[in-house]
Regions:
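Hydrophobic, aliphatic-enriched repeat segments that assemble into extended interaction scaffolds
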Residues: 9, 85-88
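Sequence/fold signature of self-assembling virion shell proteins
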Residues: 40-64, 83-84, 91-169
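A generic local secondary-structure boundary/capping motif
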Residues: 72-77, 117
């Protein structure tokens, strides 16, 4: 019974994640990546695109969600800035690894402070990956899939239950 209850709990949380993803996809303002070199629109993710998003969040007085991780005297590590969340699909992990300034989670001075789904950080964005991340099929100018990355600050949205129905604001 306990195992079945635990599995149902996981299923519930995944359903809530899918509902939240769909809500964000239908309501969020967007900034297309344009600094890449693949000849498509939107392009692949670059550091310049990340900087544009961070400037937009700062310009709208968004509060960061996570505190910085101070640097330590350890080989192969780098300090991590205060950060917003960037929620994305697992298919983007290879692309993130090639972005200038990307810090993998295992390169944090204290990787145990990272979230389980966290892949790494670029500037003031810490990327959380999920296999149920948002994809818009054949939406680029050249017909490629567009992977949506939801970049959020603290209290950017809330999910509540009303009359037994799940709702995101």
């Amino acid at each position: 019974l306990n195992e079945a209850a635990a599995r149902l709990g996981v299923s519930l949380r995944q359903t809530e994640d899918e509902l939240t993803r769909d809500m964000l996809a239908s309501t969020a303002a967007f900034i297309n990546c344009t600094a890449g070199v693949n000849g498509d629109n939107p392009t692949e993710l670059t550091r310049s695109d990340v900087d544009d998003v961070v400037r937009a969040l700062l310009g709208n007085n968004a509060y960061t969600i996570l505190d910085n991780i101070e640097g330590e005297d350890k080989f192969g590590t780098a300090p991590v800035r205060d950060a917003y969340f960037a929620l994305c699909h697992t298919d983007l992990t290879k692309d993130m690894d090639s972005v200038d300034g990307f810090i993998q989670k295992n390169q944090y001075p204290s990787p145990m402070n990272a979230l389980r789904s966290e892949w790494g950080a670029i500037g003031n964005l810490r990327f959380l990956v999920s296999s149920i991340g948002s994809i818009t099929q054949s939406a680029s100018n050249l017909g490629a899939n567009v992977y949506n990355i939801f970049c959020v600050g603290m209290e950017a949205y809330a999910c509540i239950e009303q009359d037994g129905k799940y709702c995101c604001l």
